Amino acid sequence: RLSIFISDLIKGQNTLHYLRRFERLRNAPREETEAYRFVRLKELLIHCERNVPFYRERFREAGFSSVEFSSLEQLRQIPPLTRQDLQDRWEDIIATSYRGKRLSAGSSGGSTGQPVTYRKDSHATSAGLAAHLVGWSLSGWKMSMKGLHIWGNPTTVNEEWGRVSSKLKARVFRHHKFPAYTLHDGSRLNELYELISGERYDFIDGYTNAIYHFADYLKRNGLSFNHKVKYVLTTAENLHDFQRRAIEDA
């Protein structure tokens, strides 16, 4: 908890607040969590219709009324948000109440081609990290564990990882980083192997395909570690059975 408190101070966020809320909901009866979800979703839809030009237009075209929303089935009326929408209409997707306020840019990993950029405020960043931590805790992961993050597209690595706040956060959480997009280079695969061997990480997390590619490299080259990584957490891409077996065997 102290590490999250320190990270919040460094980055001007409120992760601890959301973490407490999500942990309470995680242990609450299903009926309570479903009721909470519906109330919050309706509030969000009303906010979007009143304050977000893109969604005001989309709801009107779909014949959808946020005020009359009463069933999850009604969401089928709204066309899905696409990558093209995010790229072409990003200014209209920002709520009018947030125009001129400080927003940070985030981006997708770019694993399907061109990364998609989006904007978020400190509340979104804090809530996202809190949800991330609660999700990991379901696997048995603990915040005190030392980990390696195999992640990042060139934009994220070059623009975000070098920031002082990002480096301090990594130190506080004992969470090192390795750029996933460089693993097409055989020398970088060996560099990653030597890093993990030397640092003796408790867990590794990152893109499914990047971690599978590394596991396959270990197998093909007859490489192994002197210590066992306790957890491997994959994300952003589907984990197929053959990939799971390869990662477990490595």
PLM features: residue spans?
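A generic structural signal for short, solvent-exposed coil/turn residues
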Residues: 110, 139-141, 170, 249-250
